[in-house]
Amino acid sequence: MRLRGWLLTQIDFYFHVENKLRTACALSAKASARGLRVWAFCADADASQKFSRMLWTAPALSFIPNCKPDDRLAAVTPVIVDYEGTRLLHDQVLLNLRTEWPPFFSRFQRLIEIVSLDEEDRCRARERYKFYRDRGYEIQNHDLSESAQ
């Protein structure tokens, strides 16, 4: 969608997800394999470190190179794992792993939101969904439940 000559951020919601971080790893791998760079925006330093470890170790037969935004290899690393959002190095794919909408999401070409089966997570996701929709963003929904497969 275009607005005044600018492309609006493409927003994708993946819902009914059993394991949010495993799905985030899979989506990061998929984007990286397509030559896209991913900015994983985590809740805090601990969550950021945990997700980074998962990227290095999962899936079992491969890994997804990642680093922090201040790493000397950040400019050439496919996935940046961050929790501050103060030093954005690219504008391709933003993977939101927080419960609130990222204030800088609109500078990215694509935003990915992952919604688990947890009721609190679903409530917070509904708030984000409404926020984006009320601002005119088109949202693509992806049902990852077993019944949808």
Q: What is the role of each PLM region?
A:
Residues R2, W6, Q10-S106, L117, ...:
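Positively charged, polar, low-complexity stretches
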